[in-house]
A protein has these predicted regions:
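Sec-dependent N-terminal signal peptides
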Residues: 4-13
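N-terminal leader/linker segments that initiate helical-solenoid repeat arrays
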Residues: 16-51
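Terminal, low-structured helical/coil segments at or just beyond the last alpha-helical repeat
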Residues: 176-196
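Structural signature of tandem alpha-helical TPR/SEL1-like repeats
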Residues: 20-26, 54-66, 88-101, 125-136, ...
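Short helix-capping/linker turns of helical repeat alpha-solenoids
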Residues: 34-37, 49-51, 73-76, 105-108, ...
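Canonical positions in the second alpha-helix
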Residues: 31, 69-70, 101-102, 139-140, ...
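Hydrophobic face of amphipathic alpha-helices that form TPR/SEL1-like repeat modules
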Residues: 42-50, 81-88, 114-121, 151-159, ...
């Protein structure tokens, strides 16, 4: 299960890379304990990265607890992280419910993206649902998350399930990804335009 989650976690982690480099764990713990929901989410992410590297179940539980504290305080990134934690616990239904709420109500792009990721191929115990995945990738893209745009570009570029390949649609999403700073989107634009 950890291998499936690794890609989602790395995208989730990118949102916090600066904080993780500039603050130590003790500082994050103190800030979380003082009520800073965003720092609780960063703390959860730091623990989750350690869990991915070590496989230590106690560290995973610390991660889930920090994410839950952040989520309980209304932090969307904390809720997105808690949704990933539910998958580790084997509860895809709870994960899907929380990620949907976090995406739809809190407008958290990482939650939208993760829903797309899990639905596209049925990762993490989710039911495969290409149209559902596209819906959530679209929401992530609309919220300014370049990877969501890239995924839509990829789906339209090659076609997926009952979605026909459409180079114009692919180009539209790749260009949006590129405008949002997505290197893969920029590379895809060059490939498509170079082929014309």
């Amino acid at each position: 299960m950890k291998k499936f989650l690794f890609a989602a976690v790395m995208l989730f982690s990118a949102a916090f890379a600066t904080d993780l480099q500039s603050e130590n764990l003790a500082s994050l713990k103190a800030q979380c304990q003082s009520g800073d929901a965003a720092k609780c989410a960063v703390l959860g992410d730091a623990y989750y990265e350690e869990y991915i590297a070590s496989g230590d179940e106690e560290v995973r539980k610390l991660s889930a607890a920090a994410f839950k504290e952040a989520c309980d305080k209304g932090d969307g990134e904390g809720c997105a992280g808690l949704g990933l934690s539910y998958i580790d616990e084997g509860d895809a239904a709870a994960s899907e419910k929380l990620l949907e709420k976090t995406c739809d109500e809190l407008k958290t792009a990482t939650a939208c993206y993760n829903l797309g990721f899990f639905k596209i191929d049925g990762h993490g115990g989710f039911r495969q649902d290409v149209k559902g995945a596209m819906k959530y990738y679209e929401k992530a893209c609309d919220l300014g998350y370049a990877a969501g745009c890239e995924e839509l570009g990829g789906i339209y570029n090659v076609g997926e399930a009952d979605v026909k390949a459409d180079e114009n649609q692919a180009l539209k999403y790749y260009e949006k990804s590129c405008a949002l700073g997505g290197k893969d989107g920029c590379d895809a634009v060059k490939l498509i335009k170079g082929g014309k």
